[in-house]
Curated annotation (Swiss-Prot):
Coiled coil: none annotated. GO terms for cellular component: host cell cytoplasm; host cell nucleus. It comes from Influenza A virus (strain A/USSR/90/1977 H1N1). One of its GO terms (molecular function) is RNA-directed RNA polymerase activity. Residues 249-256 are annotated as: Promoter-binding site. This is RNA-directed RNA polymerase catalytic subunit. Disulfide bonds: none annotated. Keywords: Eukaryotic host gene expression shutoff by virus, Eukaryotic host transcription shutoff by virus, Host cytoplasm, Host gene expression shutoff by virus, Host nucleus, Host-virus interaction, Inhibition of host RNA polymerase II by virus, Nucleotide-binding, Nucleotidyltransferase, Phosphoprotein, RNA-directed RNA polymerase, Transferase, Viral RNA replication, Viral transcription. Phosphorylated by host PRKCA. InterPro entries: RNA-dir_pol_NSvirus, RNA_pol_PB1_influenza. GO terms for biological process: DNA-templated transcription; symbiont-mediated suppression of host gene expression; symbiont-mediated suppression of host mRNA transcription via inhibition of RNA polymerase II activity; viral RNA genome replication; viral transcription. A motif (Nuclear localization signal) lies at residues 187-195, 203-216. It is an enzyme of class 2 (transferase).
Amino acid sequence: MDVNPTLLFLKVPAQNAISTTFPYTGDPPYSHGTGTGYTMDTVNRTHQYSERGRWTKNTETGAPQLNPIDGPLPKDNEPSGYAQTDCVLEAMAFLEESHPGIFENSCIETMEVVQQTRVDKLTQGRQTYDWTLNRNQPAATALANTIEVFRSNGLMANESGRLIDFLKDVMESMDREEVEITTHFQRKRRVRDNVTKKMVTQRTIGKKKQRLNKRSYLIRALTLNTMTKDAERGKLKRRAIATPGMQIRGFVYFVETLARSICEKLEQSGLPVGGNEKKAKLANVVRKMMTNSQDTEISFTITGDNTKWNENQNPRMFLAMITYITRNQPEWFRNILSIAPIMFSNKMARLGKGYMFESKSMKLRTQIPAEMLANIDLKYFNDSTRKKIEKIRPLLIDGTASLSPGMMMGMFNMLSTVLGVSILNLGQKRYTKTTYWWDGLQSSDDFALIVNAPNHAGIQAGVDRFYRTCKLLGINMSKKKSYINRTGTFEFTSFFYRYGFVANFSMELPSFGVSGINESADMSIGVTVIKNNMINNDLGPATAQMALQLFIKDYRYTYRCHRGDTQIQTRRSFEIKKLWEQTRSKAGLLVSDGGPNLYNIRNLHIPEVCLKWELMDEDYQGRLCNPLNPFVSHKEIESVNNAVMMPAHGPAKNMEYDAVATTHSWVPKRNRSILNTSQRGILEDEQMYQRCCNLFEKFFPSSSYRRPVGISSMVEAMVSRARIDARIDFESGRIKKEEFTEIMKTCSTIEELRRQK
């Protein structure tokens, strides 16, 4: 029977059909090869947007720098970075006037945070540029390396464990005439293999000391490493993102803390909240504009798009904003917040791995590292690359490009939102002093502008005024990509508004299915995704039930764990059938052991082990959750785990799911091939780091975990904790006198060894 597809929509309001317009199901595109070209594009574009600014030279590093601030205003639509300082300061003053005390209060909140934050805050985050090894590392390792180098250079303030003291070391390190670092290197030797008698290359990893003079150190401290942004949908071209080093990160964190505190108090800000809270905030602004426009006014909304937001922002402007926001605050606080924008005005972009060349005729491949781009003959490159390199050459120093203007992606999201909101704030009638007025929403570079006026000419005038005000602050609204509609229909940060926010269920499609972490986590994540979509995305009961059945089917095919009484033959069916036959209570078997599915839409919030616990055979319970069973991994599992979900659009979301440690929550082993590479030394460092942390956890289990008060090293904290615990256990009779004496002796020995060291 043929079905006319339009019939499907007869009963559906038009706005609900949005889910059918999303093509984002399969895997998103990933980048391959080097990001060098994309980074050069970013650097060149950024300079082009500010080209009529003033050139200066950095006295310390000799890097040429372009300063577009207070530069000539653009005559036409071209995007440009010529923000005017006095306009930015005035916008800040008006923002404060409409929100009395907002800056003052946020500063007080931030000051508390600054004094309490521990340096381990910097271990959060994924890849970080490690300046000691000149490449990316996990954040914790990069921090450990930085602190190790600081201490070997006599910078000891960081020992207190407070972030602000670590930052004092960073500042002092920049005044040093030279800094000594430890780097890893590889030795290759040709040796004869005893067994096969062939020559083989043997690699050994060494660590060596290296001295950096002030200039080289500053260049590294100010370097942002670049990578290609992965998994971006709907774009043909990839683009570069930056990872800053440990020197910059701490300062940025404090600036963003201040800006976040301000954003929380601004009704037009789409950050830092998310999800339903964000929708409620936005709906309020829309409601306000529509209520006031009922009789005499008309109301229009622009779904806005800014051209190259990051590349036209300027750290010098952020410095002006911070100087204004903190103007009545103590000197130390103002200094610490002004360092991030100053470092960003002097930043260097690392060009990445360089270019790969291959000669088809000679079957040769060779890599041209970024350091060589400054003086290599350009005849080897194609036209577009040649143009890029010619343009960037005057900016190059040691394989990094001087990039004073522009911000790089994702660095000051909160602070740039404050700048955007300050323009929306100027739309009140008391500032426009005319018949039109505006309000709107801002979330980093995304905005929606609602304009009210008595007639169309007024709307046009309002939009023009908004557009020109943005230009004064270095924000470029794109006339090509923004569009205007009657208020009631617009899109903002991938939320579609049509008389209320429309649930766009298809955005979540990529996160349905089996994640491939392990049997335990996958089951838990799968049902949590369905539960969350019932709560947030209008996933109805019938569809949810169907999604659940499809998920279970998918799960069984992935892990080859079809029910014990099925006819399907897989590699595991022999074991599963055997287990099925010898189990009395078959309903108690987990799905991953060939058991039946007991989930329905009412019990999705319960972990499967808990759901079936009462139904399990006793010996099955014993095997499944026995802490002495070597296959039960307790090491990774806390009561709540986090999975990273990738929706079709927008940032990866952190999703919490419950997990129970069982024989199914295994953690895969590391790939062996890393052990033969230069990474090996780092891996060993990382494992040592891990062991120390695990040991510390044993002494301070999370249930009783209060941060050790006062300034003590990890060892001192553990020794004093061991003494206290031993005394309590001895006095309550839990341990014998001999054991107590032995513990005390061990503690003294450890202290003695530390003194000798």
